[in-house]
Amino acid sequence: KFGFASYSCSSDVDLALEVALKGENGVAVIMGTGLVAFARSGETLHRTGGRGYMIDKGGSGFHFGSDAFNCAFEFIEGRGGSETILKLVEKRFGKSLESSVAEIYDGGASFVASFASVVFEAFMLGDSSACEIIDRNAYEAAKIINGARKSLGNNENRIVICGGLCKQKEILYPFLEKYIDGDFLLEFLDEPIVNGAISLAGRINKC
Protein backbone atom coordinates (compact mmCIF):
# COMPACT_ATOMS: atom_id res chain seq x y z
CA LYS A 1 0.00 0.00 0.00
CA PHE A 2 2.77 2.45 0.91
CA GLY A 3 5.25 1.21 -1.69
CA PHE A 4 8.06 0.05 0.58
CA ALA A 5 9.21 -3.03 2.42
CA SER A 6 8.50 -3.77 6.09
CA TYR A 7 10.79 -2.17 8.66
CA SER A 8 11.43 -2.97 12.32
CA CYS A 9 12.21 0.09 14.46
CA SER A 10 14.32 -0.31 17.59
CA SER A 11 12.61 2.29 19.78
CA ASP A 12 10.27 5.26 20.05
CA VAL A 13 13.39 7.44 20.07
CA ASP A 14 14.13 6.41 16.48
CA LEU A 15 10.61 7.41 15.48
CA ALA A 16 10.81 10.78 17.24
CA LEU A 17 14.17 11.58 15.66
CA GLU A 18 12.91 10.62 12.23
CA VAL A 19 9.65 12.53 12.38
CA ALA A 20 11.40 15.61 13.77
CA LEU A 21 14.65 15.72 11.81
CA LYS A 22 13.94 13.53 8.74
CA GLY A 23 17.48 12.15 8.78
CA GLU A 24 19.11 15.57 9.09
CA ASN A 25 21.21 17.09 11.87
CA GLY A 26 19.70 19.14 14.68
CA VAL A 27 18.02 18.84 18.06
CA ALA A 28 14.78 16.91 18.47
CA VAL A 29 12.83 17.72 21.62
CA ILE A 30 9.94 15.58 22.83
CA MET A 31 7.61 17.62 25.03
CA GLY A 32 4.85 15.30 26.15
CA THR A 33 4.15 13.80 29.55
CA GLY A 34 7.93 13.95 29.98
CA LEU A 35 10.68 16.02 28.37
CA VAL A 36 13.81 14.82 26.58
CA ALA A 37 16.11 16.25 23.90
CA PHE A 38 18.29 14.40 21.40
CA ALA A 39 21.05 16.24 19.54
CA ARG A 40 22.27 14.61 16.33
CA SER A 41 25.24 15.46 14.14
CA GLY A 42 26.02 12.75 11.62
CA GLU A 43 26.36 9.51 13.55
CA THR A 44 26.75 11.30 16.89
CA LEU A 45 23.67 11.30 19.14
CA HIS A 46 23.47 12.90 22.59
CA ARG A 47 20.58 12.69 25.04
CA THR A 48 19.71 15.41 27.55
CA GLY A 49 16.95 15.12 30.16
CA GLY A 50 14.21 12.52 30.08
CA ARG A 51 15.06 11.07 33.49
CA GLY A 52 11.48 10.99 34.70
CA TYR A 53 9.26 13.22 36.81
CA MET A 54 11.01 12.28 40.06
CA ILE A 55 14.32 13.67 38.72
CA ASP A 56 13.60 16.27 36.03
CA LYS A 57 12.61 19.71 37.33
CA GLY A 58 10.22 21.08 34.74
CA GLY A 59 9.22 21.68 31.14
CA SER A 60 7.11 18.56 30.71
CA GLY A 61 3.37 18.09 30.56
CA PHE A 62 3.57 16.46 33.97
CA HIS A 63 5.21 19.51 35.50
CA PHE A 64 2.71 21.89 33.93
CA GLY A 65 -0.14 19.79 35.34
CA SER A 66 1.51 19.41 38.75
CA ASP A 67 2.11 23.16 38.90
CA ALA A 68 -1.57 23.73 38.11
CA PHE A 69 -2.61 21.55 41.05
CA ASN A 70 -0.11 23.20 43.37
CA CYS A 71 -1.24 26.67 42.30
CA ALA A 72 -4.88 25.73 42.90
CA PHE A 73 -4.13 24.41 46.38
CA GLU A 74 -2.14 27.55 47.17
CA PHE A 75 -5.27 29.58 46.51
CA ILE A 76 -7.44 27.27 48.63
CA GLU A 77 -5.02 27.55 51.53
CA GLY A 78 -4.48 31.30 51.29
CA ARG A 79 -0.86 31.00 50.12
CA GLY A 80 -1.33 32.90 46.89
CA GLY A 81 -2.09 30.81 43.83
CA SER A 82 -4.83 31.42 41.32
CA GLU A 83 -8.59 31.31 41.64
CA THR A 84 -8.84 31.03 37.86
CA ILE A 85 -6.69 27.91 37.78
CA LEU A 86 -8.62 26.43 40.72
CA LYS A 87 -11.94 26.95 38.94
CA LEU A 88 -10.64 25.43 35.70
CA VAL A 89 -9.22 22.40 37.52
CA GLU A 90 -12.43 21.81 39.45
CA LYS A 91 -14.45 22.21 36.26
CA ARG A 92 -12.43 19.34 34.77
CA PHE A 93 -13.00 17.15 37.81
CA GLY A 94 -16.64 18.10 38.23
CA LYS A 95 -16.08 18.33 41.99
CA SER A 96 -13.83 20.04 44.52
CA LEU A 97 -10.07 19.68 44.16
CA GLU A 98 -9.77 18.73 47.82
CA SER A 99 -11.94 15.66 47.19
CA SER A 100 -9.92 14.72 44.08
CA VAL A 101 -6.48 14.08 45.59
CA ALA A 102 -6.82 10.28 45.54
CA GLU A 103 -7.88 10.43 41.88
CA ILE A 104 -4.78 12.47 41.05
CA TYR A 105 -2.44 9.94 42.64
CA ASP A 106 -4.29 6.98 41.16
CA GLY A 107 -4.07 8.55 37.70
CA GLY A 108 -0.29 8.83 37.72
CA ALA A 109 1.99 10.99 35.61
CA SER A 110 -0.01 10.89 32.38
CA PHE A 111 -3.19 11.90 34.20
CA VAL A 112 -1.44 14.83 35.84
CA ALA A 113 0.00 15.84 32.45
CA SER A 114 -3.50 15.98 31.00
CA PHE A 115 -4.11 19.06 33.16
CA ALA A 116 -1.30 21.01 31.48
CA SER A 117 -3.91 22.55 29.18
CA VAL A 118 -5.48 24.25 32.20
CA VAL A 119 -2.39 26.44 32.57
CA PHE A 120 -2.56 27.61 28.97
CA GLU A 121 -6.30 28.21 29.20
CA ALA A 122 -5.74 30.35 32.29
CA PHE A 123 -2.96 32.22 30.51
CA MET A 124 -5.34 33.10 27.68
CA LEU A 125 -7.67 34.52 30.34
CA GLY A 126 -4.88 36.81 31.51
CA ASP A 127 -3.93 34.90 34.66
CA SER A 128 -0.56 36.02 36.07
CA SER A 129 0.09 32.74 37.91
CA ALA A 130 -0.33 30.83 34.66
CA CYS A 131 2.21 33.16 33.05
CA GLU A 132 4.67 32.40 35.85
CA ILE A 133 4.15 28.65 35.45
CA ILE A 134 4.75 28.80 31.71
CA ASP A 135 7.82 30.97 32.15
CA ARG A 136 9.35 28.68 34.78
CA ASN A 137 8.75 25.53 32.74
CA ALA A 138 10.00 27.16 29.54
CA TYR A 139 13.20 28.06 31.38
CA GLU A 140 13.72 24.44 32.44
CA ALA A 141 12.94 23.17 28.94
CA ALA A 142 15.40 25.66 27.45
CA LYS A 143 18.13 24.45 29.80
CA ILE A 144 17.69 20.94 28.43
CA ILE A 145 17.71 22.24 24.86
CA ASN A 146 20.83 24.32 25.53
CA GLY A 147 22.54 21.31 27.06
CA ALA A 148 21.75 19.19 24.01
CA ARG A 149 23.15 21.84 21.67
CA LYS A 150 26.31 22.30 23.75
CA SER A 151 27.02 18.57 23.46
CA LEU A 152 27.55 19.15 19.74
CA GLY A 153 29.49 22.38 20.16
CA ASN A 154 26.44 24.55 19.40
CA ASN A 155 27.01 23.78 15.72
CA GLU A 156 23.43 22.73 15.06
CA ASN A 157 20.92 25.58 14.96
CA ARG A 158 17.81 23.61 14.06
CA ILE A 159 15.54 22.73 17.00
CA VAL A 160 12.37 20.74 16.37
CA ILE A 161 9.83 20.22 19.14
CA CYS A 162 7.30 17.40 18.92
CA GLY A 163 4.86 15.86 21.37
CA GLY A 164 1.61 16.87 23.03
CA LEU A 165 2.71 20.33 24.15
CA CYS A 166 3.11 21.34 20.49
CA LYS A 167 -0.59 22.17 20.66
CA GLN A 168 0.44 25.21 22.70
CA LYS A 169 3.13 26.39 20.28
CA GLU A 170 1.78 29.93 19.87
CA ILE A 171 2.08 30.49 23.62
CA LEU A 172 5.27 28.50 24.22
CA TYR A 173 7.38 29.97 21.43
CA PRO A 174 8.08 33.43 22.92
CA PHE A 175 8.78 31.95 26.36
CA LEU A 176 11.26 29.43 24.98
CA GLU A 177 12.81 31.94 22.62
CA LYS A 178 14.11 34.17 25.39
CA TYR A 179 15.91 31.33 27.18
CA ILE A 180 17.49 29.39 24.30
CA ASP A 181 21.10 30.43 23.77
CA GLY A 182 22.66 31.71 20.55
CA ASP A 183 21.25 31.61 17.03
CA PHE A 184 18.62 28.98 16.35
CA LEU A 185 15.69 27.97 14.19
CA LEU A 186 12.84 26.75 16.40
CA GLU A 187 10.09 24.62 14.87
CA PHE A 188 7.02 22.97 16.36
CA LEU A 189 5.90 19.77 14.68
CA ASP A 190 2.26 18.70 14.85
CA GLU A 191 2.92 15.46 12.98
CA PRO A 192 2.32 12.28 15.08
CA ILE A 193 5.54 10.60 16.20
CA VAL A 194 4.30 7.26 14.83
CA ASN A 195 4.68 8.73 11.33
CA GLY A 196 8.42 8.35 11.86
CA ALA A 197 8.05 4.63 11.14
CA ILE A 198 6.56 5.36 7.72
CA SER A 199 9.26 7.93 6.94
CA LEU A 200 12.06 5.59 8.04
CA ALA A 201 10.72 2.71 5.99
CA GLY A 202 10.38 4.94 2.95
CA ARG A 203 13.96 6.21 3.19
CA ILE A 204 15.40 2.75 3.79
CA ASN A 205 13.50 1.36 0.81
CA LYS A 206 15.28 3.91 -1.41
CA CYS A 207 18.73 2.73 -0.29
Residues covered by each model-derived region:
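Phosphate-binding/catalytic loop of phosphoryl-transfer enzymes
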Residues: 1-83
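ATP-binding/phosphotransfer module of carbohydrate and carboxylate kinases, centering on a glycine-rich
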Residues: 19-27, 69-207
